[in-house]
UniProtKB/Swiss-Prot annotation:
Residues binding Zn(2+): C36, C39, C55, C58
Listed name of the protein: Acetyl-coenzyme A carboxylase carboxyl transferase subunit beta
Signal peptide positions on this chain: none
Organism: Synechocystis sp. (strain ATCC 27184 / PCC 6803 / Kazusa)
EC numbers for this chain: 2.1.3.15
UniProt keyword annotation of Zinc-finger present: yes
Function: Component of the acetyl coenzyme A carboxylase (ACC) complex. Biotin carboxylase (BC) catalyzes the carboxylation of biotin on its carrier protein (BCCP) and then the CO(2) group is transferred by the transcarboxylase to acetyl-CoA to form malonyl-CoA.
Keywords of this entry: ATP-binding, Cytoplasm, Fatty acid biosynthesis, Fatty acid metabolism, Lipid biosynthesis, Lipid metabolism, Metal-binding, Nucleotide-binding, Transferase, Zinc, Zinc-finger
Chain intervals annotated as zinc finger (C4-type): 36-58
GO CC entries: acetyl-CoA carboxylase complex
């Protein structure tokens, strides 16, 4: 066959038929890589998860769900969820483009969550804590009656067990579909936190992107120490609403964690990879010193009591020896 005939036959041949991808193959392909919304760089998803869902190129903190937050903060096999049975109802029979009841059902199916917060207790670097993690995927992390009840019960449990409380905040505010029932959660959670504080117990909220509305106006700003992630949007009313009300241009960094740190509304901005270690250090510093006393029949000349500080505390030595008098 001549070269001319070969090219002629090739042109007549039908192009190969591309087989469409199955939904499973397409899902795997879509999940292999994640595009940074800030710089646009594609990163292998497993590498991104290994870096706490922080872009390796620009340092942008990608939004993470509540399950990932728990995995990042709580020691393996120590997480014990509580009050998982609580589910929202539709007392107002609210309906916009779809009924609130249908919206709840669809969101529960999409996220595999009962509502916008997970609560429980576990160990953070060996330290027992009570933890609440809000999930923005569930109706924008909005605070309804179930979110308020779960957080309130978590704080009451922590008060009873004398545990520090950490709440990861990510919310658009109160849930309008529940009306006054959602707004009253602000006062209810604040009251539970006051009882917790009166017992000299530690509460640390961590403000992530975004933390706005009724959450900001209540428990997000009531911490003994308030931490925030870099470049998180934190505020009450929206930027456009404030500009239209005041009729003036706001600073470019307005309602960011850096702006709030500069004006004294948050105590520290902590990058996500350092969050667990920072929380462990702060909780350890708040823990009391526990004296280890010798047995009653021990030789007092050979045994020295020690004051033990948790291994994660900011101390030069992990154990501080105290010499006995005489």
């Amino acid at each position: 066959m001549s070269l001319f005939d070969w090219f002629a036959n090739r042109e007549k041949a039908e192009p190969p038929v591309l087989q469409p991808q199955s939904p499973q193959e397409r899902e795997v392909a879509d999940g292999l890589w994640t595009k940074c919304p800030a710089c646009g760089v594609l990163t292998y998803t497993k590498d991104l998860q290994g870096n706490w869902m922080v872009c390796v190129e620009c340092g942008h903190h990608l939004r993470v769900d509540s399950d990932e937050r728990i995995r990042q903060l709580i020691d393996a096999k120590t997480w014990q969820p509580i009050n998982e049975h609580l589910r929202p109802t539709d007392p107002l029979k609210f309906k916009d483009r779809k009924s609130y009841k249908d919206r709840i059902r669809d969101t529960q199916k999409a996220t595999d969550l009962t509502d916008a917060v997970q609560t429980g207790h576990g160990r953070l670097d060996g330290l027992p804590i009570a933890l609440g993690v809000m999930d923005f995927r569930f109706m924008g992390g909005s605070m309804g009656s179930v979110v308020g009840e779960k957080l309130c019960r978590l704080i009451e449990y922590a008060t009873l067990e004398r545990l520090p409380v950490v709440i990861i905040c990510a919310s658009g505010g109160a849930r309008m579909q529940e009306g006054m029932l959602s707004l009253m959660q602000m006062a209810k959670i604040s009251g539970a936190l006051q009882n917790h504080r009166e017992q000299k117990l530690l509460y640390i909220p961590v403000l992530t992107h975004p933390t706005t509305g009724g959450v900001t106006a209540s428990f997000a700003m009531l911490g003994d120490l308030i931490l925030a992630e870099p470049k998180a949007t934190i505020g009450f009313a929206g930027r456009r609403v404030i500009e239209q009300t005041l009729r003036e241009k706001l600073p470019d960094d307005f309602q960011t964690s850096e702006y709030l740190l500069h004006h004294g509304f948050v105590d520290a901005i902590v990058p996500r990879p350092q969050l667990k270690r920072t929380l462990a250090q702060l909780i350890s510093l708040h823990q009391p010193f526990y004296p280890i006393l010798p047995p009653l029949n021990a030789d007092s000349n050979q045994v020295n009591p020690e004051l033990v500080l948790s291994h994660t505390a900011l101390a030069v030595d992990n154990q501080i020896s105290v010499n006995q008098d005489g």
